[in-house]
Structure formats: structure tokens, C-alpha cells
Regions:
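Hydrophobic alpha-helical segments typical of transmembrane helices
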Residues: 28, 66-69, 81, 126, ...
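Acidic/polar active-site rim loop that often engages polyanionic ligands
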Residues: 25-28, 48, 66-67, 149-154
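Metal-dependent phosphoesterase signature
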Residues: 64-101
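Active-site neighborhood of HAD-like aspartate-dependent phosphohydrolases
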Residues: 2-55
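C-terminal cap/substrate-recognition subdomain and adjoining C-terminal extension
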Residues: 2-8, 84, 91-117, 121-247
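Cysteine/selenocysteine-centered motifs that mediate thiol-based redox chemistry or coordinate metal-sulfur cofactors
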Residues: 51-65, 236
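Conserved active-site and cofactor/substrate-binding residues in soluble primary-metabolism enzymes
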Residues: 23, 77, 164
């Protein structure tokens, strides 16, 4: 009897606070504000969410607030315009905020011949742009609804967060033939425990308090790249808030 072919391993990375410092949705919002997509008061709210996000990690309430504001600012905009802005945002804001240590981990998986996927609550287009720039396989993210090339301000299904990430991973593994038992997953948030628990090699990166406790008790690897860079990033954002108030 012929042996069934061995299923390959893959690697899956969260983006915000795992691969990139802070919220990529905030960075998109900042770029949109500079181009007068929305008023000053919305930018200030975005910035305060970012300070809290970097300092404390994600919460359901915070993610919902960021998502709602992001959807509101793209409502009525052309899809192509949004994609072009995302590419600009990567060059102007995100590229410099990629943690080189996390990016190196991703590249090590690429060098080992594994597919590397980003899985994020941010719009899928944001994840795809980052994956393309870093030479990774692809991305899964929250899907935005568009009609005749215009964004409606709604999402297709649920935000890719928490248990929804785990569902998406399971579906992707089935489609691509991955062995989850052999695979790797990286995240900073306890909200991603459903996803991390699905793979044989879960890793906590810049973990929030709850994930750090769980990872230690479970014997998972823990990487903390955040401590040395947290203070200057928070200072920079607070300066942006002051500029927004004066603007």
C-alpha cells in the first residue's frame, strides 16, 4: 500500500504588534488624514487608540473602535484609490515599523521552503501589501465590501479576529494541504490563543500580559522585541496628536 504524501509545514504571522509596531489601520488613518480624507478630531481619536494599543495590546473594544473609524473613512472611496494609498502607507509609515527580528523569523521559514502567511484583523489588502513587500506567500484579513469599485463602508462577514482567525487558518490549511501539527504561528495577543493552539509550534511575540502568562505555563517560546522601542514610538505618536490639535 502506497504511503500518503507528507503534508508540509507552514508559518503564520499576526501583523499588528507582532510583525509591525502598533496598528496598521492607524497608520492608514494617519496617511488618509494628511490627504484630508477626514477631519482633525477623527485623527486625534485614532492617535489615542494607537497609544493605548501599543502600551496595553489589543482589546475587543479598541479593535472595534479602530475598525469602525477605518471603515467610515473609506466609505464612498474608490477601491483602487484605497489600494494605492495602502502602498504609499507601507513606504511612508509601515516599512520603518517592521520589527527586523520578526521579519527575520519569517524569512527563515521562507528559506526553509515553507509558505509564510500573514493573518490579520486589518483589511486583507493591507496584509497582502505587506506580504508582497516582504516576499511572503500571502495574507488573510478582513474583507471589505465594494460595489462597482466603490467601498461601501461594510465588511464581508466578520472581522478576522480571535476565533475567526482560527477558522480561516483551518480552511487555508485544508485548501493548501498544510500539516498544522508541523506548522508555526506567531502572535502578540491572547485573543489569538485559538489560532496559536491549532499549530504544533506556537510562539508568543511581544506578548500581552495574558498571553505571556499562558505561554509560560504551556512552555511556548516567547520573544519580546518591544521593550527597547516602546517609549520612542509612544513619544512620536503623542507629538502627532499635538500637531493634529494645532492643525
Amino acid at each position: 500500500m502506497a504511503k500518503s504524501p507528507k503534508k508540509p509545514a507552514a508559518a503564520f504571522f499576526d501583523i499588528d504588534n507582532t510583525l509591525v509596531r502598533g496598528s496598521t489601520s492607524y497608520q492608514f488613518g494617519k496617511a488618509a488624514y494628511k490627504r484630508k480624507f477626514f477631519p482633525r478630531k477623527d485623527f486625534i481619536a485614532f492617535a489615542w487608540h494607537q497609544v493605548r494599543f501599543i502600551a496595553k495590546g489589543e482589546t475587543e473594544h479598541m479593535l472595534a473602535a479602530i475598525k469602525d473609524r477605518a471603515l467610515e473613512l473609506v466609505k464612498g472611496r474608490s477601491y483602487d484609490q484605497m489600494k494605492a494609498l495602502i502602498a504609499t502607507v507601507y513606504d511612508e509609515e509601515i516599512k520603518s515599523k517592521v520589527w527586523p527580528e520578526t521579519a527575520k523569523l519569517a524569512q527563515q521559514h521562507v528559506a526553509a521552503g515553507r509558505e509564510v502567511w500573514l493573518i490579520t484583523a486589518a483589511p486583507q489588502e493591507m496584509g497582502e501589501e505587506i506580504a508582497k513587500r516582504l516576499g511572503l506567500t500571502g495574507a488573510l484579513g478582513t474583507r471589505l465590501v465594494k460595489i462597482d469599485g466603490i467601498l461601501t463602508g461594510e465588511i464581508d462577514g466578520k472581522p478576522l479576529h480571535g476565533k475567526e482567525k482560527a477558522k480561516a487558518l483551518k480552511k487555508l490549511a485544508k485548501e493548501r494541504g498544510f500539516s498544522l501539527k508541523k506548522s508555526f504561528a506567531y502572535s502578540d495577543s491572547h485573543n489569538d490563543l485559538p489560532l496559536l493552539s491549532m499549530v504544533g509550534h506556537p510562539v508568543a511575540v511581544n506578548p500581552d500580559k495574558l498571553l505571556k502568562i499562558y505561554a509560560k505555563s504551556a512552555g511556548w517560546k516567547i520573544y519580546d522585541f518591544k521593550r527597547k522601542e516602546l517609549r520612542p514610538v509612544k513619544k512620536s505618536i503623542k507629538q502627532e496628536i499635538k500637531i493634529g490639535k494645532k492643525g
